[in-house]
């Protein structure tokens, strides 16, 4: 059986998936963040305070949505391994970048140009972080 595929329909589905992930994770952000609640079956409720743990608990019925979820989860894990914190912020920033990029694709922009632009932004922001950073020489600092 032949399956109909629409690129714009898939892009809209991806944007909706990213919105759902963003809405689930942003409740845990910051010192006043709220707990997420997951249902594990057998009347088992879990309260989750971390955005990265909440990401691991999410699951979508659509395989394309799960791919996006796993990509964002990998970004949050890498951020946590490097800095020990910031996984929720990484997820939210990545969601916003992906939503913006997908909206540009829907409007007909070239994906290579979007990718090159995001790479330039990453290098620029890395340089700014290094410019404003202060070296630490002692553990007490």
Question: What spans do the regions from the language model cover?
Answer:
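N-terminal glycine-/lysine-enriched basic segments
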Residues: 1-141
């Amino acid at each position: 059986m032949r399956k109909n595929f629409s690129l714009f329909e898939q892009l809209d589905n991806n944007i909706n998936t990213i919105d759902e992930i963003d809405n689930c994770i942003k409740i845990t952000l910051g010192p006043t963040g709220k707990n997420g609640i997951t249902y594990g079956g057998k009347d088992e409720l879990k309260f989750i305070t971390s955005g990265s743990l909440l990401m691991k608990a999410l699951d979508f019925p659509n395989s394309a949505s799960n791919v996006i979820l796993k990509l964002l989860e990998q970004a949050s894990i890498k951020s946590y391994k490097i800095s020990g914190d910031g996984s929720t912020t990484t997820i939210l920033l990545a969601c916003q970048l992906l939503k913006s990029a997908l909206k540009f694709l829907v409007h007909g922009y070239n994906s290579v140009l979007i990718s090159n632009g995001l790479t330039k932004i990453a290098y620029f922001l890395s340089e700014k972080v290094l410019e404003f950073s202060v070296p630490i020489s002692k553990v007490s600092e």
